[in-house]
């Protein structure tokens, strides 16, 4: 087991509610690490509707999911939160009163005084491609996220998909791989136009092999890919060499391992105390779409409110002997100093 990362608070989920919770906790001198199964911050805003307008953020008539994420990241910059992306919490073990040892599927271990679940509707789980036997290669040579780019250096990479994730990793990994093949079922891509243009430039320069069709079979031994068979749209067949495959077929939402953490659940949601947003387990809080209480509205602004109240209770676990005086950022010079305001 790797050495534990010690932090005051660990937040599960780096969507808008998790990010704003960093701000509220930071004002109280609470240090935060965040874990998210996605490979980028922003949660549903970044993954499902980055360019979709949002009209119900107070004081902002219209902002996109991407724009909101960028603004929140700028707002929390003074507090230097640490992000662990592309990882999913697997186990939560109580080690104090309160205190928790938390382990991710990547083997990262945290020890925290407070755990905040801000996981939206649950964990985004990658959709498995409809290729026979693909599960035998998962985790060794078939990957649904890129955790460390250097692991793909010098490899023959096969990327499958036509959205932003497929295009982004095509562009990012192309300079370091030995060879790269991009497979999509049609010659029409859903990603950002600029990314599509850059991808086609790689094809034109011979740095990327674009195949229009579908993967029908994989070849390899002991979990290590060696090649793939592609049925092209003209009904011909292509055989390619590959030792790493990245399929991007979208995501589904599942509750995931949260169900095994000893929390009370109601219809796959976590009931909370509306004064503190604490769960039935002392020291574990739930904010945002993952929680439930009478009158709950699944709005981003509701999650912001919940994060503010959560922080006022969480700080008492972090600093049990410290008297916390509520202050306003408009008038408190100490808070303004933390924010870097002159």
UniProtKB/Swiss-Prot annotation:
Record-linked HAMAP family: FENR2
Keyword terms, alphabetized: FAD, Flavoprotein, NADP, Oxidoreductase
The protein's name in its UniProt record: Ferredoxin--NADP reductase
Family: Belongs to the ferredoxin--NADP reductase type 2 family.
InterPro entries: FAD/NAD-bd_sf (IPR036188), FAD/NAD-binding_dom (IPR023753), Fd--NADP_Rdtase_type_2 (IPR022890), Ferredoxin-NADP_redctase_2 (IPR050097)
Molecular function (Gene Ontology), one example: NADP binding
Pfam families, per database record: Pyr_redox_2
Cofactor(s) demanded: FAD
Domain of life of the source: Bacteria
Catalytic activity: 2 reduced [2Fe-2S]-[ferredoxin] + NADP(+) + H(+) = 2 oxidized [2Fe-2S]-[ferredoxin] + NADPH
Gene3D superfamilies: FAD/NAD(P)-binding domain
Oxidoreductase keyword on record: yes
List of residues binding FAD: 17, 36, 44, 49, 89, 124, 289, 330
Enzyme Commission no: 1.18.1.2
Subunit note: Homodimer.
Cofactor note: Binds 1 FAD per subunit.
Enzyme class: oxidoreductase
